[in-house]
Design a protein with these regions (language model features):
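Extended alpha-helical scaffolding segments used for macromolecular assembly and cargo binding
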Residues: 1-75, 80-87, 131-180, 446
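Residue at a conserved register position within TPR or TPR-like alpha-solenoid repeats
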Residues: 1, 29, 36, 72, ...
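Amphipathic helix-loop-helix modules that constitute alpha-helical solenoid scaffolds
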Residues: 72-162, 190-201, 234-237, 241, ...
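Alpha-solenoid helical repeat architecture
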Residues: 5-9, 24-26, 57-67, 97-104, ...
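Structural motif corresponding to the intra-repeat A-B loop/turn of tetratricopeptide repeats
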Residues: 4, 39, 75, 152, ...
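Amphipathic alpha-helical segments of tetratricopeptide repeats
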Residues: 17-19, 50-54, 87-97, 165-169, ...
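Generic long, charged, amphipathic alpha-helical segments
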Residues: 404-467
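Conserved small-residue packing positions in alpha-helical repeats and bundles
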Residues: 26, 33, 69, 146, ...
C-alpha cells in the first residue's frame, strides 16, 4: 500500500508538470503512465500512454500504444484494448486471425514448428544474440495479445502464444523467452492430462530461461505457469504453493504487475476453495475485492466472482452472493468468455443454495450451447466443472419434481461423461452425481454404492468440501452408529471451516437426497 501511494504521488507530480506546460509532454505522459501502472491503476495508465503516443511518432508511438492496449486488456477494458491492439499488430506486421478456424490453423502450424525446435540452445547463446528491434517489437505485440486475451479469447491467445514463443526463440533473448514459455505452458496445460508432459517441458524451459536472465518478472511468470499447470490438472495444493511463491516474487521485486498479482490471488483462492480450506479463502477474499475496487480493476473484480460468491455463501448471506452474480452478468456482455462461465457457476450455485431449482435448471440448459461453441470448451477443467454444475442443477430440479424425467436423464448422461474423463478429479464428481440421481429415483442401494465409490476418489482428489458433502449424504443413507459417525465428521469440517448453514450447502452441492 505504501508503494502504491508513493507512485500515486509521483503521478500527481507528473500531472502538475503537464498542466504547467513543461517541455517534452510526451515524455511526461509516458512517465505518468509508468507511475500509474506501478500503482496498479491500469486503465488510467493506458490513457496516459495513449496521450504520449498521440504526441510521438514511428516505433515509439507503436510501443506506447502497445503498452496502452496491454493495460486496457489486463484491467478488464477488452473492447477498447482489442481495438488498439489490432492497430499495433498491423504496425508491426502481425496478422490478427479473423475467425476461430484461422486461429486453429495458425496454432497447428506454429505448434508443429515448435515441436521440432529445441528450447535449450537459444537460452545458452542468448547473451551473444544480436538484438533486432523490429523482431523484438513483433514479440512484444504478440506477447501482449497472448497474455491479454487469455480470459476473453482463448483460441486467439493460444495462437499468439505460439507466435510469441517462435519469435522469442528466433530472438534468443532470455527474458522474453522465459515469458513466452510461461504463457505457452499455461495454454498447453489447459487442454488437460494428455498435454501434461508438454506443459511440464515448457515450464522447466521457462524456469531455465528466467534463471539465465536473472529476471524476477520472468521467474514469477514461470512460477505462475507452474501454478496453472498444477491447477488445471487438479493438484490444488501444489498449485497454491507455486502461486503463492509467484506472488511473493511479484510483490517484492516487480512493478506494474497488477494483472499478474490478480491471477496469483484469484487462482490461489480457487485452489483453497476446492481443497476445502474455506475459512482461509473467505479470510482473503474481502480485502482482495476491496483492493480491486480501489484500483478500478474490472479484470480482478470479474475474476473474483466465484471466490466472492463462495465467501457470501459460507456466511449464509444469500443477498450479497446474488448481487455478486448480477454484477458479473452485467459486466460480461458480448461473446461467451471465462467471465460468463464464472458468472454461470456462481449464479447456478446461489440458485440451488436458496432453493430456486427451476432457475438453476433453466440456467444449466441455457449455458450448454454457448459453452460448447466457445473456445473455453477446449479447457478440460472447464468442461469437467461445467458438466458437474449442470448435473447438480438437473438433480436438484428432478428432486423437486421440475422436468423430472429430462432432468434425470441429463444428470446421468453428464455423470457418465465425468466418470470417463481423464482429468483426475472428474470421476469422483461423476460418482457423486450418480449417487444423487439414484437417490432421486429411490434406489438407495445404488446411491450408497455410488457414494462409496465417490468418497475415496474425492479424498484422493483433495476435494475436501465435496468429500464432506458426500460423507454427510452417505451417513444419512446408512443410518445407525456408522452413519452418525460420518455425519459428525462432516459437521466438524463445516464448523471448522466457518460454514454457517451446512444444510443449504448440502442442497447446493449434493442435492437429491
Amino acid at each position: 500500500a505504501d508503494r502504491a501511494l508513493a507512485f500515486l504521488r509521483a503521478a500527481s507530480l507528473y500531472r502538475a508538470a503537464i498542466d504547467l506546460g513543461a517541455p517534452s509532454p510526451e515524455l511526461l505522459y509516458a512517465r505518468l503512465g509508468q507511475a500509474l501502472a506501478n500503482a496498479g491503476r491500469g486503465a488510467d495508465a493506458a490513457e496516459a500512454y495513449l496521450q504520449a503516443a498521440s504526441l510521438s511518432r514511428g516505433a515509439e508511438a507503436t510501443e506506447l500504444r502497445r503498452m496502452a492496449a496491454d493495460h486496457l486488456l489486463k484491467s478488464g477494458r477488452e473492447p477498447r484494448g482489442l481495438e488498439i491492439l489490432r492497430r499495433v499488430l498491423d504496425d508491426v506486421g502481425l496478422r490478427y486471425p479473423e475467425s476461430p478456424q484461422a486461429a486453429v490453423a495458425s496454432i497447428v502450424w506454429h505448434e508443429a514448428r515448435l515441436r521440432v525446435s529445441s528450447l535449450n540452445p537459444p537460452v545458452r547463446r542468448a547473451a551473444r544474440s544480436p538484438r533486432d528491434p523490429r523482431l523484438l517489437a513483433r514479440f512484444d505485440a504478440a506477447f501482449t495479445a497472448a497474455s491479454g486475451l487469455t480470459t476473453v479469447d482463448l483460441l486467439r491467445s493460444a495462437d499468439f502464444a505460439g507466435r510469441a514463443l517462435r519469435l522469442a526463440l528466433d530472438a534468443g533473448e532470455p527474458v522474453r523467452l522465459g515469458r513466452a514459455l510461461a504463457v505457452a505452458a499455461g495454454n498447453v496445460a489447459a487442454r488437460g492430462e494428455p498435454s501434461r508432459r508438454r506443459a511440464d517441458t515448457l515450464v522447466r524451459a521457462s524456469q531455465r530461461a528466467a534463471a539465465q536472465a536473472d529476471d524476477p518478472h520472468a521467474r514469477a511468470l514461470a512460477l505462475l505457469a507452474a501454478g496453472f499447470v498444477h491447477f488445471f490438472l487438479g493438484e490444488w495444493r501444489n498449485a497454491r504453493a507455486s502461486l503463492e511463491e509467484a506472488e511473493t516474487v511479484l510483490r517484492a521485486q516487480c512493478r506494474a504487475v497488477a494483472w499478474e498479482l490478480a491471477n496469483t490471488q484469484v487462482w490461489t483462492c480457487n485452489a483453497l476453495i476446492l481443497s476445502g480450506e474455506l475459512r482461509e479463502a473467505t479470510r482473503r477474499v474481502p480485502s482482495l475485492v476491496e483492493e480491486a475496487r480501489t484500483r478500478d480493476d474490472s479484470f480482478a473484480l470479474m475474476h473474483m466472482t466465484y471466490p466472492a460468491c463462495v465467501t457470501h455463501i459460507v456466511a449464509d448471506d444469500v443477498d450479497a452472493a446474488w448481487r455478486v452474480t448480477e454484477l458479473a452478468a452485467a459486466h460480461a456482455g458480448g461473446a461467451f468468455t471465462a467471465f460468463h462461465w464464472g458468472a454461470f457457476i456462481s449464479a447456478a450455485s446461489v440458485e440451488r443454495y436458496k432453493g430456486d431449482v427451476r432457475g438453476a435448471w433453466s440456467r444449466a440448459q441455457s449455458i450448454a450451447q454457448p459453452l460448447e461453441s466457445s473456445s473455453l470448451s477446449r479447457v478440460a477443467l472447464v468442461r469437467a466443472f461445467s458438466a458437474y454444475e449442470r448435473g447438480l442443477s438437473a438433480i436438484a430440479a428432478a428432486a423437486a419434481g421440475v422436468d423430472r424425467t429430462a432432468a434425470l436423464l441429463s444428470a446421468e448422461k453428464l455423470a457418465r461423461r465425468l466418470s470417463r474423463d481423464d482429468i483426475g478429479f472428474a470421476p469422483a464428481m461423476g460418482h457423486l452425481l450418480l449417487a444423487g440421481a439414484h437417490s432421486v429415483r429411490g434406489d438407495k442401494p445404488r446411491a450408497l454404492e455410488a457414494l462409496e465409490l465417490a468418497l475415496p476418489l474425492l479424498d484422493a482428489a483433495d476435494l475436501g468440501y465435496l468429500a464432506a458433502c458426500a460423507r454427510t449424504r452417505r451417513g444419512q443413507l446408512l443410518g445407525g452408529a456408522a452413519g452418525r459417525e460420518l455425519v459428525e465428521r462432516s459437521e466438524r469440517f463445516f464448523a471448522t471451516q466457518g460454514v454457517v448453514n451446512p444444510e443449504r450447502c448440502l442442497a447446493m452441492s449434493a442435492p437429491g437426497f
